[in-house]
């Protein structure tokens, strides 16, 4: 089943919480987020990790372990280590990313290795002073509302299970993810076309991933904002206007055929056309859906959020596919798909 959702700032709005132990921690459409050193503290990260550990112990096979990853935000590696220690201390084996990694790389690792779930320290596209926690279910996607309700309840109950320390193994999650992308897309065909691209990682955890893929296949490109900078100077790491202005200028100046930008944890993408104009997500999804159905011959129905373009309906109808409309939110998508 193919799922399509339009990214918006509104649907991923920050979820605040106090750092007081009694304050409730609420999960939004794709995780819990708060301001660093206010609601987002080591204490609260451990509270959430304890709740996730309790969920895994009660509802999943804990021997399958949990994948833990993180983005380039301030303190993310340390917060990830704290979460990993809580999970391992509960008797759950942990594979901790050895470096910054895109959220989709954690999702892929969960699904590919058969893990019980995944924890990502990230605040996605929010301003620099925010951070958060996402939980990926055993199928690799965002946890369903039912799962998140259990985790919220476990958080409120102060769950902090203890067991024999199961150990933390540091692993590089990116190579397998890069190989999967290379196997899925016809990159040799793109290379033969002679296109030149601009890549903007927006100082986020997508840094170097697309560049590595292009380098492996001899695709010409220029890259901007690849360095780690937790302050995300002059932008929110969200691939929409006005934050893609530097990418637009680069595409024109370097005479690129197109430009691509990924957000803070590289699970959203924006595009710029050859003339420097911004290509919105609705057009990206439409092109992608047509490619998936026509070239890749993906089976199943199409699920889209109600805020996405009706072009998707026309493309689905052309290929004889039924369209199901759902509410906004990655975890709603997980349930609908």
Where are these regions (language model features)?
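Gly/Ser/Thr-enriched, mixed-charge loops and adjacent short helices
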Residues: 21-22, 131-254
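Short beta-strand-to-turn element immediately C-terminal to the catalytic PLP-Schiff-base lysine
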Residues: 37, 135-138, 270-274, 317
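N-terminal small/polar loop signature for handling phosphorylated ligands or for N-terminal nucleophile
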Residues: 54, 58, 62-130, 182, ...
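A structured phosphate/pyrophosphate-recognition subdomain
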Residues: 3-4, 22, 26, 192-215, ...
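Short, surface-exposed alpha-helical segments at coil->helix boundaries
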Residues: 76-81, 148, 207-211, 313
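Proline/glycine-rich low-complexity loops and linkers
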Residues: 98, 150-179, 273-337
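An N-terminal, well-structured beta->alpha segment
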Residues: 2-5, 11-13, 17-85, 89-90, ...
């Amino acid at each position: 089943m193919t799922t399509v959702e339009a990214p918006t700032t509104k649907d991923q709005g920050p979820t605040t919480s106090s750092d007081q132990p009694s304050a409730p921690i609420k999960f939004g459409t794709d995780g819990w987020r708060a301001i660093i050193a206010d609601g987002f503290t080591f204490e609260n990260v451990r509270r959430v990790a304890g709740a996730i550990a309790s969920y895994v112990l009660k509802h999943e096979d804990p021997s399958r372990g949990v994948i833990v990853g993180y983005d380039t935000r301030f303190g993310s590696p340390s917060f990830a280590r704290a979460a990993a220690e809580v999970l391992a201390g509960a008797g759950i084996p942990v594979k901790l990313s050895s470096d910054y990694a895109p959220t989709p790389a954690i999702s892929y690792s969960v699904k590919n290795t058969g893990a019980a779930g995944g924890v990502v320290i990230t605040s996605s596209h929010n301003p620099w002073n925010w951070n958060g926690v996402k939980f990926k279910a055993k199928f690799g996607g965002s946890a369903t509302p039912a799962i998140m309700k259990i985790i919220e309840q476990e958080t409120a109950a102060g769950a902090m299970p203890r067991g024999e320390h199961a150990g933390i193994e540091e692993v590089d999650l990116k190579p397998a993810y890069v190989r999967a992308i290379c196997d899925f897309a016809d990159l040799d065909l793109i290379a033969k076309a002679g296109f030149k691209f601009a890549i903007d990682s927006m100082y986020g955890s997508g840094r170097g991933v697309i560049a590595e893929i292009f380098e492996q296949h001899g695709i010409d490109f220029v890259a901007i904002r690849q360095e780690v900078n937790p302050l995300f100077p002059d932008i929110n790491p969200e691939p929409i206007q006005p934050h893609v202005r530097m990418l637009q200028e680069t595409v024109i100046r370097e005479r690129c055929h197109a430009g691509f930008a990924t957000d803070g944890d590289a699970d959203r993408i924006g595009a710029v056309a050859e003339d420097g104009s911004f290509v919105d997500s609705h057009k990206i999804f439409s092109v992608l859906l047509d490619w998936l159905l026509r070239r890749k011959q993906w089976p199943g129905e199409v699920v889209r959020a109600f805020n996405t373009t009706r072009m998707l309906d026309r493309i689905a109808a052309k290929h004889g596919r039924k369209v199901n409309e759902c509410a906004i939110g990655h975890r709603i998508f997980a349930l609908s798909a």
